[in-house]
Amino acid sequence: MQVSQLSPLPQLGRNPRLLPVSTDQAAAPAGPYSQAIAANGLLFLSGQRPVDSESGAIPEGVEAQSHAVLRNVVNVLQTGGSAPDRVVKVTAHLADLKDFDEFNAVYKLYSSPPYPARTTVGSQLRGILVELDAIALCDVQPAEGHPR
């Protein structure tokens, strides 16, 4: 696992301090976005889906999907120079809010006090039951020779 070449995005005219983070240990993006972006000591994770990175399979049920999503989140965090205990904000998306308690029981296994700020919302998810995005502190810096 590694940060994707820690290169700026000059073709998009973006700030060179925005560093895309990518790992094959989490679900590949389903569209034109990064798994995460590191910027100024923060790591911004895109919505992580419950897709197994090796098989591409989506597990059945809220509990299994919650574990899959949170494993993907942990892998992206680690790749981006962070960890679960450095997460400051989480947004959890549930296809059905009646699944809140089941999701929450799994979520507790992957976090500890002081818990990050969190919002849980009902969302129209395409073929999945759970998705999660997060913001965390990180240690990723631009590669040598890149502007800071």
Model regions and ranges:
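N-terminal presequence-like segments and the immediate start of the first folded domain
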Residues: 1-71, 75-88, 94-148
